[in-house]
Amino acid sequence: MATIRNQRFSLLKQPISSILNQHLIDYPTPSNLSYWWGFGSLAGICLVIQIVTGVFLAMHYTPHVDLAFNSVEHIMRDVEGGWLLRYMHANGASMFFIVVYLHTFRGLYYASYSSPREFVWCLGVVIFLLMIVTAFIGYVLPWGQMSFWGATVITSLASAIPVVGDTIVTWLWGGFSVDNATLNRFFSLYHLLPFILVGASLLHLAALHQYGSSNPLGVHSEMDKISFYPYFYVKDLVGWVAFAIFFSIWIFYAPNVLGHPDNYIPANPMSTPPHIVPEWYFLPIYAILRSIPDKAGGVAAIALVFICLLALPFFKDMYVRSSSFRPIYQGIFWLLLADCLLLGWIGCQPVEAPFVTIGQISSIVFFLFFAITPILGRVGRGIPNSYTDETDHT
């Protein structure tokens, strides 16, 4: 028995297995982590689901403007289990964004972006941006009405970039309009970007493990930690089961609710839909874009969203991190969450009064959050940065 045990531990000391053991088994984790810290592993599961289903769908998809729509219908009707693959992939994108949005708002609530985890947060923002680009490209591939016109509207935004804008649009289109060359470009990129996402996710994980996970109290301690396995594997397993049930409800009972009915109409360049709406997870950003009448101003506002997110960790460090001890910031946080939900609703409304005005006010409120956060970070003092720090700062 002792020999078997020694062999087991010697296997964990091998080059590759020792890395896995260090980061997935013996990784020191704060003992007070709540279920809100389980969305990182769920995001990894979503990414794996998207890659696996995407590879199998690509085996039956034809990237040609005359055949793309029919090839998707062929997958749904003729390929055994094709309907399940497509619904898993389409709804999996929505689940991925739900998980990442919750993961991000948890980071905002508990100030997980603060020192020394600035690089972790910045990598997370890059991952979010890559997800948006990948999801947009994937939405174009079925070549329905909303796919075609969404591609036309969104890619044309690049023309607002000074000097090189028109060149970028022509390169994206592969011609003078969205056509077969565009679809082929997007199909190629759609199978490259997920693997870039995997690389960015591994960097995100490595950066996290450099300083360790934060915790609900927002304080640091090297003593109050336990190994990730088996304690948090079991805790994450509860989240995985709940996620599987939630995901299954959408796949089997409401597979098309999160999509748009116009995308079941083949793309027609001669017929513009009455209202061009992106997928629901783009709606808050889309609302900010539409709230500014000028195209260049709208693109600048979108760029400012990501600049604010990237700059957030570099604001002056705060005395108290967790919102549990910052009632003023807590109120501002819930206002931001409500504002993002309102922006999501505005994004799917027609561009007319009063929706434009509401969108402009909501956009201002969104950016005010990032302007106020550095000020609130200096308000309040009474919790040490570490359990072992002196609590008397006088």
From Swiss-Prot:
<dbReference type="Pfam" id="PF00032">
    <property type="entry name" value="Cytochrom_B_C"/>
</dbReference>
<dbReference type="InterPro" id="IPR030689">
    <property type="entry name" value="Cytochrome_b"/>
</dbReference>
<keyword id="KW-0679">Respiratory chain</keyword>
<dbReference type="InterPro" id="IPR048259">
    <property type="entry name" value="Cytochrome_b_N_euk/bac"/>
</dbReference>
<keyword id="KW-1133">Transmembrane helix</keyword>
<feature type="transmembrane region" description="Helical">
    <location>
        <begin position="232"/>
        <end position="252"/>
    </location>
</feature>
<keyword id="KW-0408">Iron</keyword>
<keyword id="KW-0999">Mitochondrion inner membrane</keyword>
<dbReference type="InterPro" id="IPR005798">
    <property type="entry name" value="Cyt_b/b6_C"/>
</dbReference>
<keyword id="KW-0830">Ubiquinone</keyword>
<dbReference type="GO" id="GO:0046872">
    <property type="term" value="F:metal ion binding"/>
</dbReference>
<feature type="binding site">
    <location>
        <position position="209"/>
    </location>
    <ligand>
        <name>a ubiquinone</name>
    </ligand>
</feature>
<feature type="transmembrane region" description="Helical">
    <location>
        <begin position="120"/>
        <end position="140"/>
    </location>
</feature>
<feature type="transmembrane region" description="Helical">
    <location>
        <begin position="39"/>
        <end position="59"/>
    </location>
</feature>
<keyword id="KW-0349">Heme</keyword>
<keyword id="KW-0249">Electron transport</keyword>
<dbReference type="GO" id="GO:0006122">
    <property type="term" value="P:mitochondrial electron transport, ubiquinol to cytochrome c"/>
</dbReference>
<dbReference type="GO" id="GO:0008121">
    <property type="term" value="F:ubiquinol-cytochrome-c reductase activity"/>
</dbReference>
<dbReference type="GO" id="GO:0045275">
    <property type="term" value="C:respiratory chain complex III"/>
</dbReference>
<feature type="transmembrane region" description="Helical">
    <location>
        <begin position="296"/>
        <end position="316"/>
    </location>
</feature>
<dbReference type="InterPro" id="IPR027387">
    <property type="entry name" value="Cytb/b6-like_sf"/>
</dbReference>
<keyword id="KW-0479">Metal-binding</keyword>
<dbReference type="InterPro" id="IPR016174">
    <property type="entry name" value="Di-haem_cyt_TM"/>
</dbReference>
<keyword id="KW-0812">Transmembrane</keyword>
<keyword id="KW-0496">Mitochondrion</keyword>
<feature type="transmembrane region" description="Helical">
    <location>
        <begin position="186"/>
        <end position="206"/>
    </location>
</feature>
<feature type="binding site" description="axial binding residue">
    <location>
        <position position="204"/>
    </location>
    <ligand>
        <name>heme b b566</name>
    </ligand>
</feature>
<keyword id="KW-0813">Transport</keyword>
<comment type="subunit">
    <text>The main subunits of complex b-c1 are: cytochrome b, cytochrome c1 and the Rieske protein.</text>
</comment>
<dbReference type="InterPro" id="IPR005797">
    <property type="entry name" value="Cyt_b/b6_N"/>
</dbReference>
<feature type="transmembrane region" description="Helical">
    <location>
        <begin position="355"/>
        <end position="374"/>
    </location>
</feature>
<protein>
    <recommendedName>
        <fullName>Cytochrome b</fullName>
    </recommendedName>
</protein>
<feature type="binding site" description="axial binding residue">
    <location>
        <position position="89"/>
    </location>
    <ligand>
        <name>heme b b562</name>
    </ligand>
</feature>
<dbReference type="InterPro" id="IPR036150">
    <property type="entry name" value="Cyt_b/b6_C_sf"/>
</dbReference>
<comment type="similarity">
    <text>Belongs to the cytochrome b family.</text>
</comment>
<keyword id="KW-0472">Membrane</keyword>
<feature type="binding site" description="axial binding residue">
    <location>
        <position position="191"/>
    </location>
    <ligand>
        <name>heme b b562</name>
    </ligand>
</feature>
<feature type="transmembrane region" description="Helical">
    <location>
        <begin position="328"/>
        <end position="348"/>
    </location>
</feature>
<feature type="binding site" description="axial binding residue">
    <location>
        <position position="103"/>
    </location>
    <ligand>
        <name>heme b b566</name>
    </ligand>
</feature>
<dbReference type="InterPro" id="IPR048260">
    <property type="entry name" value="Cytochrome_b_C_euk/bac"/>
</dbReference>
<comment type="function">
    <text>Component of the ubiquinol-cytochrome c reductase complex (complex III or cytochrome b-c1 complex) that is part of the mitochondrial respiratory chain. The b-c1 complex mediates electron transfer from ubiquinol to cytochrome c. Contributes to the generation of a proton gradient across the mitochondrial membrane that is then used for ATP synthesis.</text>
</comment>
<dbReference type="Pfam" id="PF00033">
    <property type="entry name" value="Cytochrome_B"/>
</dbReference>
